[in-house]
């Protein structure tokens, strides 16, 4: 199983969109899960960008509040996430993108 931790994505929308496309391409080309984080107050912007930019069949795992009583770890396709939104504002979150 291969993965890459890429840290933070760009804050500016067009640069973030470009980076998401690059990461999705890497996930498919190398069967490599792409792991990234965001500052808690920008999580919702990143989440909305992910579901707007990625292909419907791409898988996204959202791991929130890890090791806290409010922990949630949810995986689904982008198509599933479009129907099942989540509130991530001010919550520590790790995002995982894979094929």
Mark where each language-model region is.
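Class I SAM-dependent methyltransferase SAM-binding "motif I" and its flanking Rossmann-like core
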Residues: 1-26
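A contiguous loop/helix-start segment that scaffolds small-molecule binding in enzyme catalytic cores
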Residues: 29-99
């Amino acid at each position: 199983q291969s993965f890459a931790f890429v840290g933070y994505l760009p804050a500016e929308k067009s640069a973030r969109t470009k980076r998401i496309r690059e990461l999705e391409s890497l996930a498919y080309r190398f069967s490599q899960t792409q792991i990234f984080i965001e500052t808690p107050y920008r999580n919702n912007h990143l989440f909305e960008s992910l579901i707007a930019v990625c292909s419907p069949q791409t898988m996204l795992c959202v791991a929130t509040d890890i090791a806290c009583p409010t922990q949630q770890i949810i995986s689904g396709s982008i198509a599933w996430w479009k129907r099942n939104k989540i509130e991530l504002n001010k919550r520590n979150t790790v995002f995982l993108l894979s094929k």
